[in-house]
Regions:
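N-terminal beta-strand motif that seeds the catalytic metal site of vicinal oxygen chelate
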Residues: 1-17, 64-66, 115-120
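Exposed loop/turn and edge beta-strand positions of beta-sandwich/beta-sheet ligand-binding modules
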Residues: 6, 35, 62, 96
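Core segments of cupin and vicinal oxygen chelate
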Residues: 9-48
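Vicinal oxygen chelate
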Residues: 13-16, 66-109
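Membrane-topology and secretion signals of cell-surface/extracellular proteins
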Residues: 25, 51, 113-117
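Conserved catalytic-core motifs of GNAT/GCN5-like acyltransferases
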Residues: 28-34, 91, 117-120
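Active-site beta-strand termini and strand-to-loop segments that position acidic
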Residues: 41-46, 102-105, 115
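A short acidic/small-residue loop/turn micro-motif
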Residues: 56, 95, 116-119
Length: 120
């Protein structure tokens, strides 16, 4: 037996606002069901779902962390800035990554990085 795929589903307060945020990061809409308040986003082979209906405490900040691994962290970072997101400068970590961290509109933390050995 094997696990074929794992897709995070993040609880959000406002699905359209969250979709717009992730589009600025370079994701595109694969599926969207406004009547469900749900969307599936993709970036290459990676998938992410956002869903209003699974947020049992809409006034409480989220504490999820999703780590994204682009193949070119510098270009991904520049794209996020070009698309109007306020993102911190890239940092080189003690654990060998070049990365930056941001929160989506619902407080879900995104760590976005590339291994220094991968050329970043």
């Amino acid at each position: 037996m094997k696990l074929n795929r794992l897709i995070p589903m993040l609880p959000v307060r406002n699905m359209p606002q969250s979709v717009a945020f992730y589009q600025k990061l370079g994701f595109r809409i694969e599926q969207r069901k406004d009547e469900w308040r749900w969307a599936m986003l993709c970036f290459g082979e990676c998938r992410l779902m956002v869903d209003e209906s699974i947020n049992p405490h809409p006034d409480v900040p989220r504490s999820s962390v999703v780590y994204l691994y682009p193949d070119d962290i510098s270009e991904f970072h520049a794209q996020a800035r070009r698309n109007g997101l306020s993102v911190p400068d890239l940092e080189t970590t003690f654990y060998g990554m070049t990365e930056f961290r941001i929160d989506d509109p619902d407080g879900n933390r995104l760590w976005i990085g590339q291994s220094r050995s991968a050329g970043a």
